[in-house]
Amino acid sequence: MTEQGNLPTQRVNISTQKMLGGIGYILMLLGWIPGIGILLSIVGFVLWLISMYQLSNILRKPSIFQKVLIAFILSIVGMVIALAFGLMAGISSFATMGDETGAILGLGLGVIVANIVVYAIILVAFYFYKEAYDILAQATAHNLFKIAGLLLFIGAITIILFGLGALLIIVGNIVLVVAFFTAPNEVEVKGT
């Protein structure tokens, strides 16, 4: 234990948590594989979530996990809203089968509103992920977490520009995996 700015610090080992995070994130990214991809994504998400929870506790930064949890809940809300609008649009198109103009207008307007609402929710969710990675970067003195969070957030903002946003999200995901595996095994934690 050392003294740093009148606050005692101690070195803590985060090697298990960073491995869980890195492996979990890789598994989440394998969701596109037919058949087993969904299972890999779920297992990966659980590993990543455990990693973020444990890092939050070990580093004495509860806001890391709080922000991850808020982002996750917002992502779920966004998916539920998208699904609800999709179902409502489908049902309304059947209800107006005799009136093609009304059906097309209602369906189009529903899709536009749903996209705007979901886009706004996803932006807020990605902002909270970015904030969590900023805190993690500061706590571990490993700036790749901050860079990954920024790339993911900018990617979410620019996703409406088709390829650019998707490309930034892909790069952000790769940087995040690298950040987990290259983070230091031991870090200084302030407090008792």
Where are these regions (language model features)?
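Membrane-interface extramembranous regions at the lipid-water interface
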Residues: 2-32, 40-81, 101, 121-156, ...
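Membrane-interface helix caps and helix-loop-helix hairpins in membrane proteins
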Residues: 34-35, 160-164
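Membrane-helix interface motif
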Residues: 80-97
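Extended assembly-interface regions of large multimeric machines
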Residues: 83-87, 101, 105, 111
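Flexible coil/linker segments and helix-coil junctions enriched in charged and small residues
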Residues: 94-106, 158
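Hydrophobic alpha-helical transmembrane segments
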Residues: 105-122, 159-162
